Swiss-Prot record:
Residue ranges of the region described as Disordered: 109-150, 248-280, 428-447, 480-534
Biased composition (Acidic residues): 493-514
Predominant localisation class: cytoplasm
Identification of the protein by name: Pre-mRNA-splicing factor CEF1
Gene source species: Cryptococcus neoformans var. neoformans serotype D (strain B-3501A)
GO molecular function: DNA binding
Amino acid sequence: MRVIVKGGVWRNTEDEILKAAISKYGKNQWARISSLLVRKTPKQCKARWYEWLDPSIKKTEDEKLLHLAKLMPTQWRTIAPIVGRTATQCLERYQKLLDDAEARDNEELGLGAGEDESSKPATDARGLRPGEIDTDPETRPARPDPIDMDDDEKEMLSEARARLANTQGKKAKRKARERQLEEARRLAFLQKKRELKAAGINLRAKPKKKGMDYNADIPFEKQPAPGFYDVTEEQAKVHAAPVGSTLRALEGKRKQELDEIEERKKRQKKGDGKSNQTQQFVAAREAQIKKLKEQEQIIRRRKLNLPIPQVGERELEDIVKIGQAGELARELVGDGNKATEGLLGEYEALGQAKMARTPRTAPQQDNVMAEARNLRNMMAAQTPLLGEENTPLHGPSVGTGFEGATPRHDVAATPNPLATSARGGVLTSTRTVPGVGTTPLRTPFRDDLNINDDASVYGETPMNDRRRLAESRRALKAGFAALPKPENNFELAETEEDEEEAEEAEPLTEEDAAERDARLKAAREEEERRELERRSTVIKKGLPRPVNVNTYKLLDDLNSAIVEQTDEEMAAAFKLVNLEVAMLMKHDSIAHPLPGTSTPGGLASEYDMPEDDFVAEAKNAIHTELANALGLPGASDEHLRLAIGAAAEENEAAFAEAWAEEREGLVYSPSTRTWVDKTSLSPEELSACYAAMINASRDRVIAEATKAAKAEKKLGKQLGGYQTLNEKAKKAIVDVMEEIHQTKRDMETFLMLKGIEEAAAPARLEKIREEVAVLEKRERDLQARYAELNDRRRENLAAIEQLEEDKIVLAAQVALEAQEGEVADGDVDMNGA
């Protein structure tokens, strides 16, 4: 008898059968799945799926595994779903990587004794010793199928193919057969019923005792709640009867018929491809395996990252044209005098490019091995309480880093020879010398005629020259400072040019970008603040001002208002003030124009803005003079503002009266757009002025009304909800107040009733007490009468009982006497006989 031990290495055939069975039966029926595999148990099938065949498992995540182990040590249950493996696989792979790192370190230090078969771990399926069995074959790759398979394997494969191809089981067939019988029974009953009806026999439907008539009633019907809309028209709508339609057309195709049609199509399609299925199976399997291998190779292949092109097509055309022009010039010179041939050097642009080669890509570090070494060193480290040196780790540039949950990847790109500096014939990919950038310059350095001296440096800039000069000066000053103390002191005055050059010299260390941006931002904000402070008070406070300013007319009006002064200096000072006011108003109309101005845009103001220091001195002088005039020397701005406000309030009434009187004599002239005196105008001009004022007032009223209507409409939209809520709240408040008033009236009524009841209660209580006393007396009399009668009743009952007893005794005596008489008579008869 052959004994089969289930288990062992998995084969490709078993993997495919397992995947097909899982797709049909799911991931819960492992016993049924394992019945398709002769040599595997349900537990092994489940382990094979979750440990190897699950598509969510990724098998090349060593770098991510080490990175997560560094971030979350010993938390394998947390790391497993992130990596896409199980916790056991993560732990085994982690230990294997540490062992590999240790073995490599031993090899580098010369401590390894060489790798042989005995040194290989037993957990590696490829390194098993003879006679050993893999303890965890579910986590290993499948073994290829042999060309000549065993009979058991062929039988298993054919049985699995037949079972998996059968989509309908025994239960499904039985259900289909029951449905067919039920349909045949129904059709036979209908045929019988029709024949009896044709013969004149009507079968009366037998009502079911329990259940529902589904032809007459609607099961689980719920009448809809009456709504707000009238549905009488819909209820009165007449539906046409299905006259001329068959029952089959009304019912449509049943689900069983649809399933049969679908099954018939599947069988037909399967029958068409069944002939060449056997030949196509092997070819399709080989093509699928080949495709998977190609995808694996593509995944392993490194991504090609080319540098950005430094020269475009148009630049290449320009370079070709420049080269052709140089060659033509050289041919022209070569055809002429030989003495001029030496004036042209060899400036071929492709001279060095012919010998140039693409630099080699910098070698990449093995991040997996570096992280494994770091983790191994950290595991072997002692406690920090001992005070020893830190654990030796690789630099921050090597490894996966600590930036996030995913490891850091350094993309390797091919170096660009055009963007790589070539000094001394050696191409370097990094910038080692400051001063010259690694990007190609616009004009290459070619000096065949030795025009530049040897001391000049290629790529120097004026900044580098100034920096070198400042460095030499500092070195010279340091040397002078190191000299011994002089016996005679001499002072040398540094010229202004040297001071300016020293100020222009830049510092040795480059300023940080963040500090520079902060300094420039602070400077801009300070300049903006000063610009805002330089504005006039009218602009700052937004006071009304004229749209257009005529400087000459305004200056004439202001100068004409100057009272004739005996002091000519005071009059000249007033004129200077008026000139400054007119120029400032003109500057405001240009720098801050109002809508409707006639000043063209982009016009620069001719006003010379005074310096900030002069303005500050003038404000201080005005402040001091105003404080002295108000009798508050040394007062602050706030105190002066309060004092001026108090003085203005005292004269407000007088000012209003004076302005009203002055206002009566002024009208607005539309021609000059100013307020003029009435007496200086003719009647026609005065009428035109009044008409213009009326029109302006009407326009202003219309504008204000339009604005008010828009505001009302806008507020109506915004406050419509609030108004509704207000109405509801008002109604609720009114209802509550009415309820309060009604409650107050009820309370007053009940208080009045309380007073009446308190007044009438004593009399009623006294009357009730008298009635109670009468009732109590009557009750006592009746109770006494009842006790007397009860005693007499008991006496009578006792007498009756005594008489009954006497009667019984008397009857007994009579009977006894009669018996004695009979006995005596008997004795006499006996004696006589």
